Amino acid sequence: LQSEKLGSLNDRQREVLRDMQSSGKRLQQFIQDFLTYSALETGGLKMQFAAGNINECLSDVCRLWSTRFQEKGLALYFLANDKLPVFPFDSPKLERVISNLLENSFKFVPRGGTVWLHAEPHMWERRAAAQPASAGERRRQDTSQPNAVKVSVSDTGPGIPAEYQQEVFDDFFRLPGTESHEGMGLGLAIVRRLVQGMGGKIWVESDPGAGCKFSFLIPFKPVPSAAGKGKTR
């Protein structure tokens, strides 16, 4: 109908069709969130690790979001980091993590704002972290070498008060005063579970009125042999 192949439309009809399309996309997103959440809750969502280039993965997600950001008047920046090695990760799950974080910024950053996506090698001092090393994962002997990738999504949005910076990752949690925004409070909860499923951890740094910076770590895994590629856990 929107192509007007069946006849011309007036402005009101175009507006109604746009609203219908937007509602359909929201419903599709809600269904996807519920299915992902349910699979994570029941342990039915398995991680599938394969060696890949994380720069390509992040760039692909940015391309998918670029049009929507432009339409809202937001700037989205990603600069590939050539210091990142090829290592095994679950590309579809990582894409979902990044997409959810970008969607979160998209919802709350006002027109004229900016969002940055950045990734870099990182030395994860697990003994100082709240989350223990996952079973079977060996620490590198040379602790001076990066053992993880740190991915960050920063924005110029309204920020998150300190008292809610842990709760934002809880199931169905929504910040007070954000009820008018789309969503059910599952996006960041799904992000947390997916990151933890990849052996990582996630946190947010923010000051009210000064934007947000969501960061997560994913440990480097050894590149599997030909016989072990595509192994799930």
Give the ranges of each region predicted by the language model.
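Short helix-loop "hinge" at the ATP-lid/N-box region of the Bergerat-fold HATPase_c
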Residues: 105-106
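Short conserved segment of the HATPase_c
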Residues: 140, 146-148, 160-172
